[in-house]
Amino acid sequence: SKDTPPSSVFAIYKELEKDAPKPRFTIGIVDDVTNLSLPEVKPAPITSAEGTVECKFWGLGGDGTVGANKNSTKIIGDHTDKYIQAYFQYDSKKTGGVTISHLRFGDKPIKSPYYINQADFVACHNPSYVVKGYKMVQDVKPGGVFMINCQWSDEELAHHLNAEAKKYIADNNIQLYTINAIDKAIEIGMGKRTNTILQSAFFKLANVMPIDDAVEFMKAAAKKSYGKKGDAVVEMNYKAIDAGVDAVHKVEVPASWSNPEADPAPKELTGRPETVKMVRDLMEPISKMDGDSLPVSAFAKNPDGQFEHGAAAYEKRGTAVTVPTWDAEKCIQCNQCAFVCSHATIRPFMLDEAEVKAAPEQTKLADTKPKAGEYKYTMSVSPLDCMGCGECITVCPVGAIEMVPQESQADQQPVFDYLVANVGKKPGMPADNTVKGSQFNQPLLEFSGSCAGCAETSYARLITQLFGEHMYISNATGCSSIWGGPAATSPYTVCLLYTSDA
């Protein structure tokens, strides 16, 4: 149900103070159609009990953030006399979507049945949220702490933070920290699992309990959880706990952030005008978990919940830490990597002479195999849509693909966009009913909200390549109704008949 913050409740009392209050009203929405909504009282008075510490964590579904926060609440609950409240908020994606953890700790009973929006501590566990401009730091109280997990230097961080965030940080004396849990996890041997490192960093910065005690209790919990897996695994977790304490870096906030330079104009979107408008007006704020700020009038053209199809291609979530890069010399052009890709983010193309000339100069090309023909071959990756599952590497028989940092592949996004928009089927290509030939067909399901490496979307995407628009989809409730029909971000690129028993 919709969150009811104190600002909405105070709005009711403010309305009742009037000589002629509205006999009918709504709260929690901006109703500019019937004009029955009450304006929220901002800033709302702090209603939490004195001494309550409020913390908010922005994570990525499947990255361990929620699990780590549940573990933190257990440690604090078992070893202190504090009251605890924990609530976990999710978007409509499976793994790889936004998770927001709301944690409260205090010496008095906690009676706050609403999201945290005046936090003592906010953590961003995925740097893509900073790049996309999510409103995170705006929920930090003046003088509070904002921690970002990223691989950036202070100068690079300044480049990625938008003007609104910089000004809020400077004007409200926000204590800004970064931690590179991404590289630390790889160095320790934990791969993508940054949650333990970030959990100990939280204990260091949030001052909920003495850090030495927190480290001791975290290590005891790790011993209990992983003891059966051997001393090496336990020791790895010990190193991660210590790393989180030691790797926190304080960023000195420049005075210039109080008057930051304006952000560059947003990139111009291409596509059907009605889709572009829907993306700008609805999809972008919804994707940033800011949909509650939209007025009722924003949905005037969508009263029945129908949205333009193909909008998932505009999300460009950029959540993968590592993405594939293709080695043209090693590749045997079997197309198996594209065949197994769950999100249609790696695709083969054959280019004629004119398409080669018009392609971006960084396009990697190879002669067709087993013998050279009139076309050039390429395997292209969309780094901002890839989920980083690595299935393409697993299936490649010759090691022609490797995973590299996403930011190193930024120049390949224009290549992918050009190929999708301008390069199509050619005469003489392999048959559609083969693994290789099917992957030259345009998928009609792309960039869905399924889990990284999901086999279900691989099958569904393949069917659209084999049968195209000659389809009727009868869908049972489950994962497929979540990744296939989320509000405003449809992964289907054509208007298919779609029924569900949801």
Question: Regions from the language model: what does each represent?
Answer:
Residues 218, 487-492, 496-497:
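Mobile "lid/hinge" segments at catalytic clefts and subdomain interfaces of large enzymes
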Residues 2, 63-67, 92-95, 130-132, ...:
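Flexible loop/turn segments at secondary-structure boundaries
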Residues 55-75, 192-196, 450-462, 467, ...:
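Conserved phosphate/anionic-ligand binding catalytic regions in large, soluble enzymes, centered on
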Residues 312, 336-356, 382, 387, ...:
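Iron-sulfur cluster-binding cysteine motifs and their immediate structural context
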Residues 54, 83, 122, 144-146, ...:
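Beta-sheet entry/capping signal
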Residues 2-54, 238-241, 245-325, 333-335, ...:
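Flexible inter-domain linker/hinge segments
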Residues 1, 49-61, 65-284, 356-360:
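Active-site cofactor/cluster-binding pocket
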Residues 498-502:
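Conserved small/polar residues in nucleotide/adenosyl-binding loops
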